[in-house]
Protein backbone atom coordinates (compact mmCIF):
# COMPACT_ATOMS: atom_id res chain seq x y z
CA UNK A 1 0.00 0.00 0.00
CA UNK A 2 1.28 3.44 -0.93
CA UNK A 3 0.04 6.25 1.30
CA UNK A 4 0.97 9.91 1.56
CA UNK A 5 1.84 12.15 4.49
CA UNK A 6 0.40 14.68 4.66
CA UNK A 7 -2.65 13.66 2.68
CA UNK A 8 -2.64 15.59 -0.62
CA UNK A 9 -6.04 17.14 0.15
CA UNK A 10 -4.66 18.48 3.44
CA UNK A 11 -1.42 19.63 1.80
CA UNK A 12 -3.24 21.76 -0.77
CA UNK A 13 -5.90 23.05 1.62
CA UNK A 14 -4.24 24.01 4.90
CA UNK A 15 -7.59 24.98 6.43
CA UNK A 16 -8.72 21.33 6.50
CA UNK A 17 -7.97 20.02 9.98
CA UNK A 18 -10.19 17.00 10.63
CA UNK A 19 -10.30 15.29 7.23
CA UNK A 20 -8.82 12.00 8.43
CA UNK A 21 -10.80 9.02 9.59
CA UNK A 22 -7.67 7.73 11.37
CA UNK A 23 -4.18 9.06 11.98
CA UNK A 24 -1.16 7.64 10.16
CA UNK A 25 -0.25 5.20 12.95
CA UNK A 26 -3.83 3.89 13.19
CA UNK A 27 -3.98 3.51 9.41
CA UNK A 28 -0.79 1.44 9.35
CA UNK A 29 -2.06 -0.75 12.20
CA UNK A 30 -5.36 -1.34 10.39
CA UNK A 31 -3.51 -2.29 7.21
CA UNK A 32 -1.30 -4.72 9.14
CA UNK A 33 -4.44 -6.37 10.53
CA UNK A 34 -5.55 -6.86 6.92
CA UNK A 35 -2.27 -8.74 6.36
CA UNK A 36 -0.89 -6.14 3.94
CA UNK A 37 2.66 -7.15 3.05
CA UNK A 38 4.08 -3.64 3.31
CA UNK A 39 3.06 0.00 3.66
CA UNK A 40 5.05 2.79 2.04
CA UNK A 41 4.48 6.27 3.41
CA UNK A 42 5.63 8.85 0.88
CA UNK A 43 6.20 12.43 1.98
CA UNK A 44 3.85 14.60 -0.06
CA UNK A 45 5.50 17.94 -0.72
CA UNK A 46 5.80 20.62 -3.41
CA UNK A 47 8.29 18.62 -5.49
CA UNK A 48 6.20 15.44 -5.38
CA UNK A 49 3.05 17.39 -6.29
CA UNK A 50 4.72 18.53 -9.54
CA UNK A 51 5.26 15.00 -10.92
CA UNK A 52 3.42 14.50 -14.20
CA UNK A 53 0.95 11.64 -14.23
CA UNK A 54 2.87 9.72 -16.92
CA UNK A 55 6.09 10.06 -14.90
CA UNK A 56 4.25 8.82 -11.81
CA UNK A 57 3.13 5.72 -13.71
CA UNK A 58 6.55 5.06 -15.23
CA UNK A 59 8.85 5.99 -12.33
CA UNK A 60 6.81 5.28 -9.21
CA UNK A 61 4.30 2.57 -10.13
CA UNK A 62 6.48 0.62 -12.56
CA UNK A 63 10.13 1.23 -11.63
CA UNK A 64 10.00 1.77 -7.85
CA UNK A 65 6.95 -0.21 -6.76
CA UNK A 66 7.01 -2.80 -9.55
CA UNK A 67 3.24 -2.96 -9.10
CA UNK A 68 1.35 -5.85 -10.66
CA UNK A 69 -2.10 -4.91 -9.33
CA UNK A 70 -3.37 -1.40 -8.64
CA UNK A 71 -6.56 -0.98 -6.63
CA UNK A 72 -8.26 2.36 -7.28
CA UNK A 73 -11.65 3.98 -6.82
CA UNK A 74 -13.41 5.52 -9.82
CA UNK A 75 -12.63 9.04 -8.65
CA UNK A 76 -8.89 8.42 -8.15
CA UNK A 77 -6.72 11.28 -9.46
CA UNK A 78 -2.95 11.65 -9.45
CA UNK A 79 -0.09 13.66 -10.90
CA UNK A 80 0.48 17.37 -11.32
CA UNK A 81 -2.83 19.26 -11.07
CA UNK A 82 -4.66 15.91 -10.80
CA UNK A 83 -4.11 15.31 -14.53
CA UNK A 84 -4.03 11.51 -14.20
CA UNK A 85 -7.09 9.36 -13.72
CA UNK A 86 -8.26 5.75 -13.88
CA UNK A 87 -8.67 5.92 -17.67
CA UNK A 88 -5.01 6.86 -18.03
CA UNK A 89 -3.92 4.02 -15.74
CA UNK A 90 -5.96 1.59 -17.84
CA UNK A 91 -4.40 2.99 -21.02
CA UNK A 92 -0.93 2.00 -19.76
CA UNK A 93 -1.83 -1.42 -18.28
CA UNK A 94 -0.25 -3.49 -21.04
CA UNK A 95 2.75 -1.23 -21.62
CA UNK A 96 3.79 -1.34 -17.95
CA UNK A 97 2.47 -4.83 -17.17
CA UNK A 98 0.02 -4.14 -14.34
CA UNK A 99 -3.69 -4.71 -13.82
CA UNK A 100 -6.17 -2.10 -12.61
CA UNK A 101 -8.75 -3.36 -10.14
CA UNK A 102 -11.74 -1.18 -9.24
CA UNK A 103 -13.55 -2.73 -6.27
CA UNK A 104 -17.19 -1.83 -5.89
CA UNK A 105 -17.82 0.98 -3.39
CA UNK A 106 -18.90 -0.08 0.06
CA UNK A 107 -22.51 0.70 0.86
CA UNK A 108 -23.71 0.52 4.45
CA UNK A 109 -27.39 0.81 5.30
CA UNK A 110 -28.15 2.25 8.70
CA UNK A 111 -31.50 3.09 10.19
CA UNK A 112 -32.85 6.14 8.32
CA UNK A 113 -29.58 6.73 6.48
CA UNK A 114 -27.32 5.39 3.80
CA UNK A 115 -23.54 5.61 4.03
CA UNK A 116 -21.53 5.39 0.83
CA UNK A 117 -17.78 4.85 0.90
CA UNK A 118 -15.84 5.21 -2.33
CA UNK A 119 -12.73 3.75 -0.75
CA UNK A 120 -10.97 0.52 -1.42
CA UNK A 121 -11.74 -2.42 0.82
CA UNK A 122 -10.78 -5.92 -0.20
CA UNK A 123 -9.83 -9.29 1.19
CA UNK A 124 -6.86 -11.49 0.40
CA UNK A 125 -9.22 -13.81 -1.50
CA UNK A 126 -10.15 -11.00 -3.92
CA UNK A 127 -6.53 -10.48 -5.02
CA UNK A 128 -5.62 -14.14 -5.55
Spell out what each predicted region is.
Residues 1-128:
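Nucleotidyltransferase catalytic core that binds NTPs
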